[in-house]
């Protein structure tokens, strides 16, 4: 397992041919090292494949008394649900979400992969939400979180910390 604030589980997984999942806040308890009100930073699994990831998620979910955002998992096992998944009727696709730049060749590989969805009868749309301002909002929220967590370090060594971290 690991944690994810802005892609720390998902990005390395994507680069290494494994699966990383950022669960909903509170799904996997975080312990006490983070402010109890923070919902940006979550714990989650990384695994070789989706089946293993579901198994890890089953093992990691649940309420933990020292994490007030955590909650009991009263639903069925993720492994069980995975075996009952139906073919999606509609999916949206965007190689870059209009947020990051992408090499043309990589975008083409991604576009060719969406044929799998079309071949199983899924409607594929390219509707992209308006993400204007999202990066700035994320960086502000991240700076506040880091300022809370690292107050003593910030007071003594602010000049040594990257500006995009401290805002």
Feature locations, PLM:
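Short glycine/serine-rich loop segments
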Residues: 1-64
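Short low-complexity, flexible loop/linker segments enriched in glycine and/or proline
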Residues: 14-17, 138-143
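Electropositive phosphate-/nucleotide-binding environments in soluble metabolic enzymes
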Residues: 18, 47-51, 104-107, 111, ...
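Generic secondary-structure signature for well-ordered alpha-helical cores
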Residues: 23-26, 33, 51, 55-66, ...
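Gly/Ser-rich, acidic/histidine-flanked active-site/gating loops
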Residues: 40-42, 65-140
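Short helix-loop capping/hinge segments that flank enzyme active sites or metal/cofactor-binding pockets
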Residues: 80-94, 143-167
């Amino acid at each position: 397992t690991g944690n994810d604030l802005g892609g720390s589980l998902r990005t390395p997984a994507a680069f290494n041919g494994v699966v990383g999942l950022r669960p909903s806040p509170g799904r996997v308890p975080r312990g006490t090292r983070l402010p109890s009100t923070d919902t940006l930073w979550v714990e989650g699994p990384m695994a070789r494949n989706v089946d293993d990831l579901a198994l890890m998620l089953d093992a990691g979910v649940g309420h933990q008394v020292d994490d007030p955002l955590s909650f009991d998992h009263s639903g069925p096992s993720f492994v069980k649900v995975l075996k009952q998944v139906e073919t999606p009727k509609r999916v949206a696709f965007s190689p870059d979400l209009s947020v990051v730049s992408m090499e043309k060749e990589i975008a083409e590989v991604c576009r060719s992969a969406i044929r799998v969805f079309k071949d199983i009868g899924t409607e594929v749309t390219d509707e992209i939400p308006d993400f204007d301002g999202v990066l700035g909002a994320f960086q502000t929220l991240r700076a506040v979180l880091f300022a809370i967590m690292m107050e003593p370090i910030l007071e003594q060594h602010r000049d040594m910390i990257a500006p995009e971290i401290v805002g």
